[in-house]
Design a protein with these regions (language model features):
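Membrane-interfacial, low-structure loops and terminal tails that flank and connect transmembrane helices
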Residues: 1-11, 146-172, 232-249
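Hydrophobic secretory-pathway targeting helix
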Residues: 1-44
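Membrane-water interface of alpha-helical transmembrane segments
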Residues: 11-22, 169-179, 199-202, 206
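Small-polar-interrupted transmembrane alpha-helices in polytopic inner-membrane proteins
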Residues: 24-32, 102, 131-135, 168-193
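Extracytosolic (periplasmic/ER-lumenal) interhelical loops and adjacent juxtamembrane/interface segments
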Residues: 41-119
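Interfacial helix-loop-helix junctions of multi-pass membrane proteins
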Residues: 42-46, 110-120, 187-212
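Mid-length scaffold segments of soluble, non-membrane domains
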Residues: 112-152
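Hydrophobic cores of alpha-helical transmembrane segments in multi-pass inner/ER membrane proteins
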Residues: 131-136, 210-226
Length: 249
C-alpha cells in the first residue's frame, strides 16, 4: 500500500476523530434549532444571564431575579416574559438549555428566537458551533498526523505551499498566524463591545463566531490526531514538506 504524505498508510484515526468532533458540534448546533422549534410557543422568555454560571436552572436562580433594566448583566426577568427553569424541561431540552446557560450570557438582544422561544445560545455561539463543525470537516478532509500539533495543523495546506515555511522553520509562527486570523475578528468585536459603547450586530457575531470556530475545531482535531505511536516513536519516519526532518532535543 502506498504511503501518504506523512509516511503512514492510512488516515483512519484522523477521519474517526474528526467525525466524532463534527458529530458533537453539529449535533448540539442542530438541537439549538430543534429545541425552541419543538417546545410550546412562548416557553422560553427573553433571558439575560452570565457566562460560566447557572442562571436559569430553577425559578429561584439568579437570572430570574430583578437586577434592574440598566444592569450590565441580568435584567428584571419579570418584565421580560417571566421566569424560566430549564430543569423543568424534558431531559434533552434541559441539556440543550442547561449547556447554553453554563457557557453563554444568553442575552436576548444578541440571540435569535424560534417559535417565540429564545434559542439556547447567542448568535456568536451559533457561529462558533458551526465553525467547529466546519473545522472538524476540514481537518477530516485534508489533515494528517505529523507527530506534532503544529505540523499536523499545517498539513491541511498542500505540501508545496508549505515548503518556504519549512525551509525557514517558521511552522509555529505560521500556525499561530492562522489561528490569529480566525480568532482576531471575534476578539476585536467582542472586546470592543465589552469595553466601549459599541454594540455589534447579529450577522457580524455569526461571521466572527464562524471564523473562530473553524480554527478552534481545526486545532482541536490536530491536537487529538497528533500521536507519535503511529510512527513507532521514531521521528525520522515522519515525512514533512521540503524534506524536513523532526529531531528530538
Amino acid at each position: 500500500m502506498a504511503s501518504l504524505a506523512n509516511g503512514l498508510n492510512d488516515r483512519t484515526r484522523e477521519v474517526g476523530v474528526c467525525k466524532t468532533v463534527a458529530a458533537i458540534a453539529g449535533g448540539y448546533l442542530l438541537l439549538c434549532f430543534i429545541a425552541p422549534a419543538m417546545m410550546p410557543e412562548g416557553s422560553v422568555p427573553e433571558l439575560s444571564g452570565r457566562a460560566n454560571a447557572m442562571d436559569y436552572a430553577t425559578e429561584g436562580s439568579w437570572g430570574n431575579q430583578d437586577h434592574g433594566e440598566d444592569s450590565p448583566v441580568g435584567h428584571d426577568q419579570s418584565a421580560h416574559g417571566g421566569t424560566f427553569a430549564w430543569t423543568e424541561l424534558n431531559p434533552v431540552w434541559a441539556f440543550v438549555y442547561g449547556f447554553g446557560d453554563l457557557n453563554c450570557h444568553q442575552k436576548h438582544e444578541r440571540s435569535w428566537e424560534i417559535n417565540g422561544n429564545q434559542m439556547p445560545v447567542c448568535t456568536r455561539d451559533i457561529g462558533i458551533f458551526l465553525g467547529l463543525f466546519a473545522g472538524a470537516l476540514l481537518f477530516g478532509w485534508r489533515g494528517l498526523n505529523r507527530w506534532t500539533i503544529r505540523d499536523s495543523f499545517l498539513s491541511v495546506f498542500p505540501d508545496h505551499a508549505l515548503e518556504p515555511i519549512y525551509l525557514a522553520d517558521r511552522r509555529m509562527i505560521a500556525m499561530l498566524v492562522v489561528i490569529g486570523i480566525g480568532l482576531g475578528p471575534m476578539a476585536v468585536d467582542g472586546f470592543t463591545q465589552m469595553l466601549t459603547d459599541y454594540e455589534s450586530n447579529n450577522p457580524l457575531r455569526i461571521l466572527t463566531g464562524i471564523a473562530a470556530g473553524v480554527v478552534m475545531g481545526w486545532w482541536f482535531c490536530s491536537a487529538l490526531c497528533a500521536r507519535t505511536k503511529y510512527f513507532g516513536d521514531d521521528p525520522a519516519s515522519v515525512l514533512l514538506p521540503a524534506d524536513a526532518r523532526l529531531t528530538l532535543k
